[in-house]
């Protein structure tokens, strides 16, 4: 970076600040631009596609201050930490070099600026390891703060993958593991001091003498302290977030990342998903809450029924539903507005949005009170008429983006501001009024008020009228035909006009700061209201979707899973003639082996079973004519097959790792959905594993299971075990080929129709005909059927010990890292 002695004072200042923020791109304010130098300049030039120049032979690139947000978004999305260095004084007023300080460090997990955020949650997570993984994670934009612990690294990583975690901060020993496991995640290693003095940091942040009442463990204190220190470092503030909430696994159905992906629950690589189908919310808050519900279905029947009852109330009252949703469409993102208020970074437009949202609360409450099932919810919505009054009195309805130009604080709020604003905007009119007043007082009709650069404002009186000049006039200049005077009032008026712009800026900014302080007293109550409005939005949304798509209210049973004419909530939206199918499972039908050709709908059928279970437990109605559903503690899926190139794991290894997780973690109350397990290895190995796994799930776990497979040999299990049944997909053969009817019926697929599917896909006729010849030969010589018969007759050893694999057996069913 060159010899420091040869640098200008400004560049020395830059180097000193950069030394403190080595790991960040430093954007250094110079007038109307933010400049970057040296390596930072080369990076932003490349990422932002802007010109790279030089200053004192140092690479330099700059961005206009008014376009900062657009460029920041690109830098952060590209995985960079950015430090914003501002000028702390007016360059024209500075004595020597302008004072500059870093006012903000922006990382993927510490964004509060609306322009840089999507509507989704954006979590920053701190994590430590001491026998288990303990985490604290916060959405800085909404203030939500959670604590969660994990027994294994696999569980921790799984949670991170599905939970809108955009950044993880951790100790050195976890850094490498996380970067290897989730390469695209922004992970930052923290120095050891972040994890020290944590109890004092928590007390300081919340302004408490004691934190015993928070009921958090020592490890949770440690990780919270680190999180709060990091927030202070990036936001330059030590503002208290919401009190931490512990995410209790016992309250929610567990959905691992593979299940979330396989069932297409939320937006991801696969495109069409349940969230997009269900999400017709009116507010960003409601959309975020709906996504949380989908990822954390309820497990307590009482809580499910309470939510379902509210959904049903709206479902049965479409006029009320439409009215409430119309009101909600006028509610802004209060969670994020209130967080910006808490950090002192709220804008005038934010506060007007808050006011407009609060205006709607009384109307929403009145509407809800018309339905007896919603009266209690209406009572939980607190009105903030005092806040509305404060904002109505203080702010214009269409204020500027920032205070200081005189177009934010409403007229009548401050006499002093009004006076200076009147001078600034109406000085000519004021001078005319002053001139007319002086003419009336003196009787000098030709008296006029003028201005020049030497004397400023003056009163000019013709020579013939000088005798009428009052004593308080002070002579300043004698001309040939007139005399010029000033008065104390005119001098004060001049001083006001000359300083009016500066005064308007200072006073309006000061009043806006006072307003923010006054409103901050209401933040906790307003956050509770925001939470209630987001719940109202999510609940009424589920009712609207249920009416729109013809869903039915599910009943909850002790164990029977019966759904009449069940449909796949996502697929049916994109297929004009979707074929509905029944689901029927109980103790006598605990496991289904589902066979049928490719493209027949096996995978769609078993996936819709999982989707209906999830939808029911978030309190939603479900796509069916009738539904009786048990409450599941977890939904497991094992579907598809692909290599993981990034970790070097083969298809079969990944498949067996997922199978191992199911066999270890599933309980009698779980739902297991399997699709083509065993396809990643040889036919004999695949059938052996699939058979043994099916027996283990049936005998040792005893949960409800659907297993879609091309191994028709597995259908023989139904002759061995009373509770295993077979399903297949109807196919009609015609002269023109095969027609897949997508209707699920009891029975076994007589063949896979793979060659017919190949023909439909456009495989050349010669290849198709040769395939038919080979199939005839292989079918005649196969001894697999004979061997399966031996299996069925009881020659295969049964797994005897529940939840335990016999010692010495190949450790396919052990969870953990597989070398």
Swiss-Prot record:
The keyword Ubl conjugation does not apply. One of its GO terms (cellular component) is cytosol. SUPFAM superfamilies: DNA repair protein MutS, domain I, DNA repair protein MutS, domain II, DNA repair protein MutS, domain III, P-loop containing nucleoside triphosphate hydrolases. CDD domains: ABC_MutS1. Keywords: ATP-binding, DNA damage, DNA repair, DNA-binding, Nucleotide-binding. This protein is involved in the repair of mismatches in DNA. It is possible that it carries out the mismatch recognition step. This protein has a weak ATPase activity. NCBIfam families: mutS1, PRK05399.1. This is DNA mismatch repair protein MutS. It comes from Thermosipho melanesiensis (strain DSM 12029 / CIP 104789 / BI429). The lineage of its organism: Bacteria, Thermotogati, Thermotogota, Thermotogae, Thermotogales.
